[in-house]
């Protein structure tokens, strides 16, 4: 049984509060900024113990750099076990756009320590985002 206390959202909010980091609720989850990076925890009411922390929009994809961005995503996905990179397509002001997102996913169990999972996720995402940028140079 999932209690309100042991959800991914509450785990993250508890950690951010302990660290003095301000969080903002959005339609899709919880946003926060850390060390110059903007993070988003997707909240899934169907799976409240599914921890999906993302770094959205780390790279804008265009027709000209699409193949290079896709190959860099594939390379990251082979190198990292829990962090995955993907091209995310969206509509902005009536125009179709795409960007690269990196995502850390983990199912939470009742014994998990919030500091451990959040710090591991944040560090892995930042490392992967920096590695992605290096692959493009």
Where are these regions (language model features)?
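Short, internal acidic amphipathic alpha-helical interface segments
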Residues: 55-103
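Long, continuous compositionally biased terminal/linker segments
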Residues: 36-67
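Generic recognition of long tandem-repeat/solenoid scaffolds
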Residues: 28-34, 53, 98-102
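Generic alpha-helical secondary structure
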Residues: 5, 9, 66-69, 118
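Charge-rich, low-complexity N-terminal segments
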Residues: 1-46, 82-88
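A short acidic/glycine-rich loop-to-helix N-cap element
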Residues: 108-121
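A conserved amphipathic terminal alpha-helix motif
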Residues: 118-137
């Amino acid at each position: 049984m999932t209690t309100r206390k042991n959800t991914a959202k509450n785990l993250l909010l508890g950690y951010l509060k302990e660290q003095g980091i301000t969080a903002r609720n959005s339609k899709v989850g919880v946003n926060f900024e850390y060390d110059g990076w903007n993070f988003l925890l997707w909240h899934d009411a169907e799976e409240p113990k599914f921890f999906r922390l993302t770094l959205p929009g780390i790279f804008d994809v265009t027709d000209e750099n699409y193949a290079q961005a896709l190959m860099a995503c594939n390379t990251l996905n082979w190198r990292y076990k829990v962090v995955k990179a993907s091209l995310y397509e969206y509509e902005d002001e009536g125009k179709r756009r795409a960007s690269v997102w990196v995502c850390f996913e983990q199912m939470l169990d009742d014994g998990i320590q919030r500091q451990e999972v959040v710090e591991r996720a944040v560090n892995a995402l930042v490392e992967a985002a920096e590695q992605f940028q290096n692959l493009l140079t």
